[in-house]
Amino acid sequence: MSKKRLYEIAKEVGVESKVIVAKAQELGLSVKSHSSSVEEADANRITSSLKAGTAKDESKPAPKATPTPKEEKVEPKVDKASVAKSAPAKETSKAEVKEASVALKKPKSRNFKAEREARAKAEAERRKNGGGRDNRNRNQQGNDQGKRHNNDRRNQKGNGQGDHNKGNRDNSTNHDRNFQGKLRNDQNQNNRRDNARNNQAGPRIDLKARAAALKAEQNAEYSRQSETRFREEKAAEQRRAKEQEKARKEKQQAEVAVQKAAAETKPAPKPAPVAPQSAPTAQVQDTRRKKVRPNKSRDNHRVNEDGPKQTRNNKWNNQNQVRNQRNSNWNKNKNKKGKNNRGNSAPKLVTERKFHELPKEFEYTEGMTVAEIAKRIKREPAEIVKKLFMMGVMATQNQSLDGDTIELLMVDYGIEATKKEEVDNADIERFFVDEDYLNKDAMVERAPVVTIMGHVDHGKTTLLDTLRNSRVATGEAGGITQHIGAYQIEEGGKKITFLDTPGHAAFTSMRARGASVTDITVLIVAADDGVMPQTIEAINHSKAAGVPIIVAINKIDKPDANPERVIGELAEHGVISTAWGGDSEFVEISAKFGQNIEELLETILLVAEVEELKADPTVRAIGTVIEARLDKGKGAVATLLVQQGTLNVQDPIVVGNTFGRVRAMTNDLGRRIKTAGPSAPVSITGLNEAPMAGDHFAVYEDEKAARAAGEERAKRALMKQRQQTHRVSLDNLFDTLKAGEMKTVNVIIKADVQGSVEALAASLLKIDVEGVRVNVVHSAVGAINESDITLAEASDAVVIGFNVRPTPQARQQAETDEVEIRLHSIIYKVIEEIEDAMKGMLDPEFEEKIIGEAVIRETFKVSKVGTIGGFMVTNGKITRDSSARVIRDGVVIFDGKLASLKHYKDDVKEVGNAQEGGLTIENYNDIKVDDVIEAYIMEEIKR
């Protein structure tokens, strides 16, 4: 019998796959997911049980008719509660009336302001009860008074009141009536109309009178409190005076008692009350009285006196006298400070220092200075410095303290210290981590983001080409996708966002970036090639990102296609099909002929439904940069993937280390749009610089905050780059010395997009040629310009253009300066070319090659020549230009060059195997019988 998948049964019955899986498990079938297979009989059982369940539900009566009596019972409870609540409300209102009546009692002390406001209130009541006639007369009088022009401010105020029908003051003192006539008649007519309207509307609430009464009550209460306070202070002062007087009297009595006791205890022989002593005291008093200067009589001739005193009495009639008084030396010494002029300056009052209580809590930040802490806790910096010194910390008032020291200091003061959590406005990552940023009630279903991964030329771009009905693959050089493309298609009313990642080994970072923002990975494997290195790498990226994998076995139309082999190879790497009991879906397709494409899309939507992908479109947009480039007309263009929120045109945005405002926004079809929701890929313009691919972006509340955050991020990135200094240590000393001996190939990289720049620079730095390394002097996005040529000339570098061309001026300058420009469109050709250039820069490397061995049979000593060794070749051959080693008992005794080589008496170039001959060695004569002569040459190694 044939088998059926559960999702096929769900499609036939018209229910969700989850319901079918639950029903199958309820019937005792061993199924795991919607893609599990069951027999035809089991499928019929599932459908019949579902139909029976729906029939039972229809046969049951509607259970929603019963709750009505419950609602009727609830109503009287609500009424009782409201009645119960109304009773205390009435009681409280009575209590409020009593309190108000107590508060309205006339104060004991007379408050003129309160009386005046009470009179205003009574006047307002009388005017309200009097009707329109008196009011009209008063308005008439106010108009007459209001139109009189006088310089008095009170008349100006009355004029304003008359214009607004509020002239209620008696301006009877004004008798000027210049402005009368038509204007006054019109105003009177308006007043009559207003009075008639007031009479029709009935009595109005006079808010001014009510405010005046309330103010009067407040003033009365304040005056009553002031009077009570004054009386209490006066009584306290009297008590203090009485206590002081009592203490003074007690002190005097105590002194008198002490004197009496002293007089009683002492005997009489003491000298008498000493008249001679009293006499000198009287003389001293007389002399002092004589020294007091007598009162001088007023000088009658002072009028004729000349000098500053005379001018002071005359109050200085002219300006010259004032200037002379200021510049004269008459009173110059009066303002001097010194021993003789102490009485001239009044004593300064010493203000007592106020005592401030310590706070109970102290919120600190890392790096606070001593002065800041002293200001916060209301203490002197010297006191804190002293405490720190006692704790063993030497600090000044301008020195910053770390968090631990601040906490210890606060413990010494008995204050609870807490570290202030500062929100970093420049931190974009907090939007992706903070769960409170999203509103869970506003979550909606979003489109899945699908990344297509696989090895080079396995059909990724062809699959996207088939999905979008476009010819993307024809534009790629060598059939290789150079940078990420983001596209969105619609299937069955639902949207799917696709990311196309490059498959070449150089684009590892770009594949990892694609896996980090994706929801589902479609791993495309060619049925004829099988699993390749980049296929394994894509599997690892997907597993690291924790996203489900759907395997698309492509090129099944080829005759040598073997899908079963692909399934087995993937199982070895942990990707197991659901048919084998795994979690990964396998779909056999042919991207070229469009075979089973619909089935692949349905599988993607099913997996997305199981994943329950949701987003909040109400918040400010956040997401990731897919790609960035520089356009000649538009400037920096960035391809963004919105992950949460909604991105709008004119939004202030921070992207990586740059910022700007969304000037224009286009979708994947090149059409201009104004908004982009979650999972939508868009290209925007308006940034200051081209960001890095993989950077996060976030929309801020205003442009000022976005500018501050962008500038702060750029500054931090620059500081981080400056701090990356490589210092020499014992561990890397040898590597540093070795790097100094290495030769370098300087290159300047210019590419069309940022992702290609990163991939190309990383690939060139990874080229492993011993003795030579690549130094990337500069890398950027855009065309090759004159500044690049100037930099290449200064640094002796090669300019590499990837999918870009030099400007005419740059080309002409390169020819003049003899700077080499290499233009490429396929990355592995660039790598091969640079690798060959690096190999050509190396010094020739030689390898030792042993060509023969000989054994010394006899030695001959010649006085002028030295020791001649007669030998026999045992292996290989001995040549005249070869080097020779003398080996004795397995140990190398000497290594040098042959001086001569003879066969019998003839000089020869070489002696072959099993032949005899004679030789001499340069600068060595200690040749002995049975020594082994090893001949070798140095050959150059090709790299």
Swiss-Prot record:
UniProt source species: Streptococcus thermophilus (strain ATCC BAA-491 / LMD-9)
Domain of life: Bacteria
Residue ranges, annotated region (G2): 479-483
Gene3D superfamilies noted in UniProt: 1.10.10.2480, P-loop containing nucleotide triphosphate hydrolases (3.40.50.300), Translation factors (2.40.30.10), Translation initiation factor IF- 2, domain 3 (3.40.50.10050)
InterPro entries linked to this entry: EF-G-like_DII, IF2_II, IF2_N, P-loop_NTPase, Small_GTP-bd, T_Tr_GTP-bd_dom, TF_IF2_bacterial-like, TIF_IF2
Ranges for region G4: 554-557
Localization, UniProt: Cytoplasm
Domain tr-type G intervals: 445-614
Family: Belongs to the TRAFAC class translation factor GTPase superfamily. Classic translation factor GTPase family. IF-2 subfamily.
Chain positions covered by the region annotation Disordered: 29-349
Region (G1) location: 454-461
Compositionally biased tracts (Low complexity): 254-266, 313-332
Chain residue ranges for the region called G3: 500-503
Known role: One of the essential components for the initiation of protein synthesis. Protects formylmethionyl-tRNA from spontaneous hydrolysis and promotes its binding to the 30S ribosomal subunits. Also involved in the hydrolysis of GTP during the formation of the 70S ribosomal complex.
Residues covered by region (G5): 590-592
Residues at which GTP binds: 454-461, 500-504, 554-557
Pfam families in the record: EF-G_D2, GTP_EFTU, IF-2, IF2_N
GO MF term list: GTP binding; GTPase activity; translation initiation factor activity
Cellular component GO terms, alphabetical: cytosol
Protein keywords: Cytoplasm, GTP-binding, Initiation factor, Nucleotide-binding, Protein biosynthesis
NCBIfam families: IF-2, small_GTP
Compositional bias segments (type: Basic and acidic residues): 69-82, 112-137, 145-155, 163-196, 224-253, 296-309
Name of the protein: Translation initiation factor IF-2
